[in-house]
Amino acid sequence: MKSRFLIRNTKITNSTGYRPVAWLFFMLYATVCFLACSNATDEAAQFFLKGNVQLQKREYKEAIRYYSEAITKKPDFADAYNNRGLAKFRNDDREGALADYTRALDIDPDFNTAYFNRAEARLETGDPGGSLSDLQRVEKQYRDSTFYQVRLGDTYVRLTKLSDAQSAYDRALQLKNDNVEALTNRGALYYSQKAYQPAEADIRRALQLNPKQDAALNNLSLLLAHRGNYADALTYVEQALELQPRQPYYLNNKAYLLLKLNRPSEAFPLVQESLQRDSQNAWAHQTLGLYWLGQKQSDKALTEFRIAEKLDASVDQLYYYIGMVEMAKGNRARACEAWQRGELANDDLAIKQRALQCL
């Protein structure tokens, strides 16, 4: 289930601020052990260490190159596969990261960190069930990690097990009450359940702790938009885009706000770019439908709304807009059917239109 509201993912990475301290100790221990255990593999170890330096510097292509050299020298180097997976993930190569984590686990089936990292890659490649399986595999070792609980919550959200997600985020914050990712993601969960006050409390707390948390900026923008404060909302999503200029959800959300502010010519290229980056985002298809609706091109609008429906029928107000287009095309029965489906989803606008037009 995708959303206009963004869940911020926590990653176990190399010295970037998100990785649990225990993993840092593991990596350093593994490196020292590796260096001490075999002079024959010293060259591979040197490439591995160079890769770690580049990973810390966020030079992901260079890190990948060094890790690949290490693997060439020592094909069963599980740590190098794991860290190359991290670098690939950071470089937006999800499938490549998944393959590297799996290879690390083929070499060392007890490599808990690789299970944790693969859980994220599986989640990001559309396999929340596989993600949960990996997380359960390392539950004993990581259950008292706030980062583990955030990942578990994110996975439960994708599996639409929302009460379990709530429990995981709550546990993450019990373990570390200033965990910005946990606050951001629990706030997103509250928003999805229309619990707007606790959503705002979590999001504002996250931004107090980290004013540059792009997901929290985006989510606060949408809370303000929900109240109709579109101009103020625009300033926050623009801040999010300054931090992540290519993020497709942020691009779409800015386009949506520009439509609400009657600036369609500015909105159109943004929603197009959003869909180029993620064609499976139902919210972006709805935004494009709203653009065409404003241009009085009902057929194009309906096409986009129907695509959104196939991708995620839970998109807010989707059936209200489908009904409006069908009514404009003279299809009263289809309009009433759409509004009835919106009523089942507790869409206030659909409920109102059905009462006015169909009952």
Feature annotation, model-predicted:
Residues 38-40:
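Bacterial signal peptide processing site
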Residues 42-73, 86, 90, 120, ...:
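Alpha-helical segment of the N-proximal tetratricopeptide repeat
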Residues 57-66, 91-103, 125-137, 159-171, ...:
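Structural signature of tandem alpha-helical TPR/SEL1-like repeats
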